[in-house]
């Protein structure tokens, strides 16, 4: 119990939870805040080697600290806006997605060095027909399997995001210019975010805290991180938290990332499609 409370204390202090609380309380987030979050991990990690009580959080601190550091060094929302404003939607987004792949491969390499196993970081398709746990979810019929639930969650996520973007408004334009680019950007973005917030995080938390905590930690960090993302606000947090929960659960139960990636990919197609239409509408397609 004590180590679990410590884990969640670190999540609260170093994850986007702290950043969102600061933003709501003060109206802005200082530029140094990202480095303060990294500092929390930098202090907790060596402490985990000195004190037996802190040992279970070493994996989380190492992996999440690395994620925070590389994100702070190589990316950021303001830089994303700068790329899109300077180069237009397609070249700007392509540059961002390539940058995302560099980050994802670096994080996966770091996670692999810790586990020395591709399956240990879920970097494989997985057992696509694995049963959904717990068994009571199947009620009285045959076992509910991920080959059914995976596509259903993906399609439901796509419909939810479609409702969100249409409600919040989007420019109208010839969709043929952006459709294939939206698919490409969604495929890359889904892989990048799954690598960071599922493969790396889940594989770091799972050995010491079990499936439930691994799923919840991934869900909270991914979901709250969309407070300023797309979709954003409380609706964005709820939608992405639901996606994050099912994606992390699918990754653990199928022992792979294909279904998590697919569930993420489908709503991302909608996001990038309408984002691109907005760019076209403002004559910034590139």
Feature-to-residue mapping (PLM):
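Residue-level signature of transmembrane alpha-helical cores of multipass secondary-active transporters
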Residues: 104, 143-151, 182, 186-187
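Alpha-helical transmembrane segments and their membrane-interface junctions
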Residues: 150-173
């Amino acid at each position: 119990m004590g180590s679990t409370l410590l884990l969640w204390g670190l999540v609260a202090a170093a994850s986007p939870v702290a950043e969102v609380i600061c933003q709501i309380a003060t109206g802005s987030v200082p530029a140094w805040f990202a480095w303060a979050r990294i500092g929390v991990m930098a202090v907790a990690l060596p402490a985990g080697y000195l004190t037996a009580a802190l040992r279970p959080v070493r994996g989380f601190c190492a992996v999440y600290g690395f994620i925070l550091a590389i994100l702070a060094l190589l990316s950021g929302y303001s830089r994303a806006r700068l790329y899109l404003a300077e180069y237009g939607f397609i070249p700007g987004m392509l540059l961002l997605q390539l940058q995302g792949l560099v980050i994802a491969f670096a994080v996966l390499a770091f996670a692999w060095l810790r586990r020395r196993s591709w399956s240990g970081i879920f970097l494989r398709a997985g057992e696509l027909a694995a049963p959904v746990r717990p068994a009571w979810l199947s009620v009285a019929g045959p076992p509910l399997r991920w080959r059914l639930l995976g596509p259903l969650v993906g399609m439901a996520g796509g419909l939810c995001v479609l409702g969100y973007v249409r409600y919040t408004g989007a420019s109208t334009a010839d969709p043929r210019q952006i459709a294939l680019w939206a698919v490409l950007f969604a495929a890359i973005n889904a892989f990048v975010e799954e690598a960071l917030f599922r493969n790396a995080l889940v594989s770091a938390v799972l050995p010491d805290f079990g499936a439930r905590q691994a799923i919840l930690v991934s869900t909270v960090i991914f979901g709250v991180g969309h407070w300023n993302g797309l979709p954003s606000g409380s609706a964005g947090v709820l939608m992405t938290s639901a996606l994050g929960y099912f994606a992390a659960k699918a990754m653990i139960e199928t022992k792979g990332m294909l279904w998590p990636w697919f569930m993420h990919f489908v709503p991302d197609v909608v996001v990038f499609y309408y984002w691109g239409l907005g760019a076209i509408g403002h004559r910034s397609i590139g």
